């Protein structure tokens, strides 16, 4: 015979935070006790040791995703393609009694409503949209976005406000379960709820990232949403000024394991007059002094002959230790005009501009060492920048990059490292894939503690 107290002790053994809830209900429910008379009369028997069974249940439950999906997207199943075209199959788990065929032109907006009772499904046969949705029953729910592509079905839960921004000419089927009156808005089907205007539509269409910047795949899955946020370092000049708000969401590429933001805000808007100067941090200054001494020793660099470039050089913090070691041939590349001016004032030669193919001809080549600290998080045009770095390198040269490590972000829950300047979030796996595409090889990796 097993009592509730017995079960509680076993549960607490594997999960010390568990609590027991006492009820007076005679009918078994979600918190029924194993000593309940009605259950015992049914002759319930444990086929396995209770201790092991509870341990297994707690272990499995701990790994279950408890996130509430307000709206989700799926592709077709059991697809078949030949020279005639492609067949995709979609399973509908509930009856459909009406189908609407809808065409929408690029740049238009639909929905801006919610369904109080019914679940809505939309099957997209052509085009592409950005969906924006929000749980209206939860006052703290963030506004979330996702992309729906041709050949995918989107399911919208009841009481979820949603809007469609059409990024291409689009055709879709609206699969309706239940009653739908002739007028679009009615108590039994749809209630108007405008929460996306034309300004937000234009903002999304101008900066949304539809494909992986590492491999080009469109199979991106949203893994984190922090709602709409202002740009972190663009401070207001006046108290009553208003900031533009952008989605702050991380998408995961199922093809190459790259993680990136759902939007790519124009780099000139964020970096042309950058406020953060790296030299203000003693941790960074000390780190780059130690790094310079290490690189000189390991790579056998010569203060007279070696040529060193720092991409995204900020105020010259990583090059100053080389200057102090009497290296004559150093160059910073910095897009922020205020920082480039500051570095040049401090006698650290700095080119003001982005590292692009257009600017490549203005920069001396054959570098023995190219540094890039956190630049691979700050660049939307990753491949172009990386190709330029390889082009600037001497045949025996080395590129050393520093990036925030995704595994540490997950382990330490440092979500404050997620902001719009950081377009990308790297693991070693995704970095190896990225450089392999460029026929470059990562031959060494190590952790450094600079944050």
List PLM regions with ranges:
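A short glycine-rich, Lys/Arg-flanked "PGG" loop and its adjoining helix->strand segment in the class I
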Residues: 383-398
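C-terminal substrate-binding subdomain of Rossmann-fold SDR/epimerase-dehydratase oxidoreductases
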Residues: 1-75
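Short acidic-glycine-tyrosine-enriched beta hairpin
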Residues: 136-158
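Double-stranded beta-helix
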Residues: 73, 142, 163-204
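Short, glycine-/aromatic-enriched active-site segment of Class I SAM-dependent methyltransferases
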Residues: 401-424, 428-430
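N-terminal juxtadomain amphipathic helix
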Residues: 207-283, 446
């Amino acid at each position: 015979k097993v009592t509730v107290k017995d079960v509680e002790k076993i549960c607490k053994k594997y999960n010390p935070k568990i609590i027991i809830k006492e009820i007076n209900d005679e009918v078994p429910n979600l918190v029924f006790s194993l000593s309940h008379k009605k259950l015992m009369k049914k002759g319930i028997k444990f086929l396995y040791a209770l201790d092991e069974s509870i341990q297994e249940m707690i272990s499995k439950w701990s790994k279950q995703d408890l996130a509430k999906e307000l709206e989700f997207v799926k592709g077709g199943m059991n697809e078949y393609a030949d020279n005639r075209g492609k067949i995709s199959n979609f399973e509908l788990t509930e009856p459909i009694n009406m189908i609407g065929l809808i065409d929408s032109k690029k740049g238009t907006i639909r929905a801006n409503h919610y369904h109080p009772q019914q679940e809505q499904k939309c099957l997209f046969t052509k085009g592409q949209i950005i969906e924006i949705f929000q749980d209206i029953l939860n006052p703290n729910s963030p506004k979330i976005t996702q992309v729906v592509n041709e050949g995918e079905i989107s399911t919208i839960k009841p009481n979820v406000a949603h809007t469609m921004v059409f990024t291409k000419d689009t055709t879709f089927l609206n699969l309706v379960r239940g009653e739908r009156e002739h007028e679009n808005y009615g108590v039994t089907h749809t209630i108007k709820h405008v929460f996306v205007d034309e300004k937000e539509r234009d903002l999304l269409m101008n900066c949304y990232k539809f494909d992986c910047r590492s491999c080009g795949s469109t199979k991106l899955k949203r893994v984190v949403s922090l709602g709409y946020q202002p740009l972190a370092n663009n401070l207001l000049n006046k108290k009553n000024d208003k900031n533009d708000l952008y989605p702050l969401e991380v998408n995961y590429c199922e093809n190459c394991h790259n993680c990136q933001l759902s939007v790519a805000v124009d780099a000139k808007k964020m970096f042309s007059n950058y406020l953060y100067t790296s030299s203000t941090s003693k941790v960074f200054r000390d780190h780059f002094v130690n790094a310079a001494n290490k690189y000189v020793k390991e790579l056998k660099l010569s203060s007279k002959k070696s040529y060193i470039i720092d991409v995204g050089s900020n105020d010259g913090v990583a090059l100053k230790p080389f200057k102090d070691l009497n290296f004559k041939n150093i160059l910073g590349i910095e897009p922020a005009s205020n920082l480039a001016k500051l570095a040049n004032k401090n006698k650290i030669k700095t080119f003001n501009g982005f590292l692009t193919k257009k600017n490549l001809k203005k920069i001396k080549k054959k570098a023995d060492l190219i540094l890039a600290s956190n630049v691979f998080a700050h660049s939307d045009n990753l491949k172009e920048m990386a190709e330029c770095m390889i082009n600037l390198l001497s045949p025996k040269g080395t590129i050393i990059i520093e990036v925030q490590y995704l595994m540490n972000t997950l382990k330490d829950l440092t979500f404050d490292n997620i902001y719009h300047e950081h377009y990308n979030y790297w693991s070693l796996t995704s970095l190896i894939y990225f450089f392999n595409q460029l026929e470059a090889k990562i031959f060494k990796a190590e952790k450094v503690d600079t944050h």
